[in-house]
Regions:
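Signature of Gram-negative outer-membrane beta-barrel scaffolds
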Residues: 1-63, 83
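C-terminal beta-signal and adjacent terminal beta-strands/loops
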Residues: 138, 191, 244-264, 278-282, ...
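Residues on the lipid-exposed face of transmembrane beta-strands in outer-membrane beta-barrel proteins
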Residues: 56-60, 116-120, 171-175, 185, ...
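Gram-negative outer-membrane beta-barrel transporters
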Residues: 5-6, 133-136, 141, 148, ...
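Outer-membrane beta-barrel translocator domains and adjoining extracellular loop/strand segments
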Residues: 9-16, 52, 81-87, 94, ...
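Membrane-embedded beta-barrel scaffold of Gram-negative outer-membrane proteins
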Residues: 61, 67-73, 79, 83, ...
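Residues that define the transmembrane beta-barrel architecture of outer-membrane proteins
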Residues: 48-52, 110-114, 165-167, 223-227, ...
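Repeated loop/turn-to-beta-strand initiation elements of outer-membrane beta-barrel proteins
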Residues: 65-68, 125-128, 180-183, 237-240, ...
Length: 367
């Protein structure tokens, strides 16, 4: 719950808990007990997790048109259920790659967030808002070291060991709709870093005999620059609005195509998430006109999504950094008369692109 005093001070405490009706993986050296005793010897019941999450927010007016706002809070996030329950039968092969087991005893991920900002009216119905933020995430889910299994082989499980943080600022300029015009623009600069974006990345590094990562690298969702804007024009019976966005590309890990590098001094590879995908730009337009048809209230509308029909590339080939082509295609035949289908069908990835231009035109009638 939360309480406020004269809309200036807000505080609250949240009590969170997770109670998993499940058991933890068996002991690392599991002997073959009779089925009736196996659960008692080889498994243990998971204990519930509890956390108290304090939060506080303060808004202090410095003029009749300006205010400083500060907030601090703890946030509790239950791990993805696949990390808790993956491989629920605890089936492990007798080799050195027994796979990953879910860990129902994972602790919730804990994020501590700090914000400080300033909001000021700069003109009639127009204001700016600058907010600086920092988010620190502990108990980020990672992968354990290899656990030996009796009599041979090993496996790994998910555990709370990694770390991530996000920091940056957001600047907003907003004008309320008045006099037939309104709009706003917001810009965010952000850095999101951590040891691993996904526990699977740590698992594959371990399979390649790489040491656990200790340095911070850009996370998969690290989007350095984000610019959004909107405008609205309107009259008595009509309105036209636009929504646009310009985002810098998220990171990806580049790689050479197979066979390019060889020899004892071969290049070991690029750092994870060391390059960026192409930037994203999108513009949508919406227009509507109200009228009366046969005594009924009607509204004609036209919505155009991706007005400029830009092919935004959200996923890319790692050897080129583009969705449109890969160097792999240069070394193989793209077609084979003796086969159904060909490589071209694999190289064409429409799911890697954003939606093309789409136009919706219609009418709404109210009785």
């Amino acid at each position: 719950g939360a309480v406020s005093i004269e809309n200036l001070f807000t505080t609250g405490v949240e009590y969170d808990s997770t109670v998993e009706s499940y058991t933890q993986a068996f002991d690392r050296q599991l002997y073959t007990y009779r089925d009736s005793f196996r659960w008692g010897y080889g498994y243990k019941t998971v204990k519930p997790s509890y956390q108290i999450s304090p939060r506080i927010g303060i808004a202090y007016p410095i003029t009749d048109k300006g205010v400083i706002h500060v907030s601090y809070g703890h946030f509790f996030q239950v791990p993805n259920f696949s990390f808790l329950y993956e491989n629920p039968e605890f089936e492990i092969t007798n080799n050195n790659n027994g796979g990953i087991l879910g860990n129902a005893d994972l602790k919730p991920e804990k994020t501590v967030m700090y914000e400080i900002g300033f909001k000021q009216e700069i003109a009639y119905r127009t204001a700016i808002d600058l907010t600086i933020f920092y988010r620190d995430t502990r108990d980020w889910v990672g992968i354990s070291t290899a656990i030996k299994k009796y009599p041979v082989g090993n496996y790994r499980k998910y555990e709370n060991k990694d770390y991530a943080n996000t920091r940056g600022f957001t600047l907003v300029l907003d004008r309320q709709f008045t006099g037939g015009f309104g709009g706003g623009v917001d810009y965010t600069w952000m850095i999101a870093e951590g040891t691993y974006s996904n526990p699977q990345d740590a698992y594959f590094d371990a399979q390649d005999n790489q040491a656990p990562r200790l340095n911070m690298l850009p996370l998969d969702w690290d989007q350095t620059h984000t610019l959004n804007f909107r405008t609205t024009f309107g009259g008595k019976n009509w309105i036209i609005s636009s929504i646009g966005k310009l985002w810098t590309g998220k990171p990806y890990t580049p790689e050479f195509k197979t066979g390019v590098v060889s020899g004892s001094g071969a290049f070991a590879g690029f750092a994870d998430n060391s390059e960026r995908k192409p930037n994203i730009f999108d513009l949508d337009i919406r227009a509507s006109y109200s009228l009366s048809l046969l005594g009924l209230k009607s509204n004609l509308y036209c919505n155009i999504y991706n007005l400029l029909d830009i092919r935004n590339e959200f996923s890319v080939w790692n050897d080129t950094g583009r969705s449109t082509y890969t160097l792999t295609a240069k070394d193989v035949s793209l077609t084979d008369p003796g086969r159904i289908g060909h490589l071209n069908e694999h190289l064409l990835r429409p799911d890697w692109y954003g939606e093309p231009r789409r136009v919706n035109i219609g009418i709404n009638v109210s009785l």
